[in-house]
Every structure is written in C-alpha cells, then in structure tokens.
Amino acid sequence: VFNEKLQISGLDEVDLDYLDQDRQKNSLTLKKSKKKYFLTGSSFNADNFIEDLLSNDDKGSKIIDINSNLEIDIEKIFLDSEYYLTDFKGDISIKNNEIQKANLIGSFSKNKKLKLTINKDNNNKITTLYVDEAKPIVKRYKFIKGFDEGSLDFYSSKKSKKSVSQIKIYDFKLKELPILTKILTLASLQGIADILSGEGIRFTEFEMNFKNEGDLMTIEEIYAIGPAISILMEGYVEKNKLISLKGTLVPATTINNFIGSLPMLGEILVGKKTGEGVFGVSFKIKGPPKNLKTSVNPVKTLTPRFITRTLEKIKKN
C-alpha cells in the first residue's frame, strides 16, 4: 500500500480508523472504481492541511501517489479542536502526486460555508478560500487573541517557490492584540485602548497583501478600517526569527473631520476641544517574535497613500 516515500500507492481499497496526535478520530475509506478514487467517511482532522494551505506548503498534497480524480464525501471535517465542517464534498484532480484542480465545500452551523478551489495551469497554482466563519483561520496567528465574528477571503498565486497572496476579512471584532494596545497606549489614545481591552474594537474591513519565498514573508501592505481607528502598515517577517513592521494609525475622528463628517466616537477618543488629542501616529515594530520592540511618533499630516486607501474604502462602503 505504501511506496518508498511512504505515500499511499497502488491500491484498490483501504480503510483508515484511528486517533491522531490531536486525539481526533479519523475514519475514512479510500476506494478505487475504474479510473477514479472515492474518499468517504465519518470524520477527518484537516488541521495540518489548513496550516499547509495558508503557508503555501505542498507537502500535504503528496500523501497519495496516484494520478487520477478523487471524489470526496466526508460527514465531518475538523478544522481544529473547536471548529468543524459537516457535509464536506468535492472533487480533486491529482497529477504527478500534486493537486492540479480542486473544488471543495463544507458547512458550518447556521448555514455558513467554507469553499476551497485550487487550479494549476502550467507552473502557476491559484488557490482561493472563502470562509463565512473566519475565526478558525485567524486564530492560527497566535499574536491575535479575542478575534470574533467576520468572514474571510484568501487568494494566492504560486509559481515555483514564490507566492503572491491576499487576505481580506470583513466585519469583525478584536478584543486583545498586545501590539496594538501598546501602540495606542504610547500614543496616549487611552480611550481606544480601553475599548480594545473591554468590549473590543470593530473593523469593517482588513486587507493584507503579501509575498512568500522560503521563510521570508514580505508584507507589501496591511490596511484596516473601522469605526474607531484605521491602520496602514508594511514590513517583513522571517519565520521564527524576526518581525519588522512600520505604519500609521489614525483615529476615526481625525478621518471624519478630514472628510467633513461628524466624529463617530467624539471626545472619548480625541478630547473635547478642537486640536486636543493626537492627529495620528507613526509606529515601528521590530525584533524576535518573543521580544518585539515598539516605538511611536505623532504625525501632523496624513500621507497621500493613507488618504487614498481610506477614501477608496469609504466610497466602496
């Protein structure tokens, strides 16, 4: 059943029923019928598969040594220890031990969906992931805590060992984000910091555009906008070694005044009098993941890039 690379190979039928290292039950049957394979079962833990997908690691797609179409119908798919999908179905086309095409869909509760597509043309692989329930994806980023609600769109184009990706998250709330809390505190925006540590700060949209090559992630732009604050930043991350980010944070009241609107949160954020409080702040975050250093400086004007991105989002909404 297994070849020298420990891949499942040359089989007509195999039954799998075991507890994995996460203590999740996996119960599957892989069966060949004519030139097609069928993967059915009651449960499967896809935690590692999701991790590989987000990091653009192909190792998870090379478990089965077949060149065929694979039809999937699994009752329950575990995304982690808390979240799971039901009625997970779809088709995967495999060639040279790599996924060439995939179209998969599953359901959360309350009619929420997860949809995954993969299309490989020549040497370019396009991956899209849409999730009505963003939390099981976002919680994988350990520095974000207290994330709630929201839907997520993920797009990635990979050629050779380089990938260009985009993540968008809509209508979500953050309750804990240590780095952001520190920036707000250093910037004397205690009103917003208190909201963040209490009921949480709501964002209408988050967009991150980035590239991956080896252990280096280059963040071309992160932009987030919400009723309380807007943030624009860029930088890079060396996996398990170094994080380097710089950006601008501006209270919503500043943006509203700039475009001639009434302040949304009023004096709690920037004070009672005109000119009181901070117009905005620039910040830098740098260091090893467990020892990040943060610096903050006030800014008197907004960059054209920040203004353009903000107006784009306001017009869109």
What are these regions (language model features)?
Residues 1-217, 222, 229-317:
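Membrane-proximal interfacial segments on either side of biological membranes
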